[in-house]
């Protein structure tokens, strides 16, 4: 784990280091901590209503690599979700050791957020994901989410699990809409609904989870 700048974020560092993780998961924890970077300098706050440009900047910050080759999408999406919650660029991820092996989302959640995030019931299409997110925004004003997809189709690799993010954008005098963010990618970081649909067959398995303010 790399810490840059002053000691102004010692509370974050100590919280991450003090997580009570099962000893059986110690190797996974080491992989996560080795890849995780924490910015200790005071950062400029992003606005409450995030724009597409804000999200693109935040996603690029999170992917802290020169040459990205790692299966660290779970960590990237958790870092971005954490940063969006705090409206600051705080956490980022380098490539993970054993780059072809993904990370356990439950362990990542415990390290980043202090507990495993509650997961939605299974959604069968990206359209259902969009509907679920907008519904949760209407009811609770939740606006930032992590999406776990079980049937993501990646070039060369084929079908695999993949985590990415979604945020509800509220532009002035316009209807709120869902913007997907894939910080694992180095191009087209903000795919449209139609573009992201191309990575899935007609049916799939999707789960939505989000950080609960009361656990902060």
From Swiss-Prot:
Keyword Transcription: no
Domain of life, source organism: Bacteria
Record flagged with keyword Flavoprotein: no
Residues passing through the membrane, by range: none
Keywords of the record: Plasmid, Virulence
Role this protein plays: Not known. This protein is involved in the virulence of salmonellas.
Family affiliation: Belongs to the SpvD family.
Name of protein: Virulence protein vsdE
Organism: Salmonella typhimurium (strain LT2 / SGSC1412 / ATCC 700720)
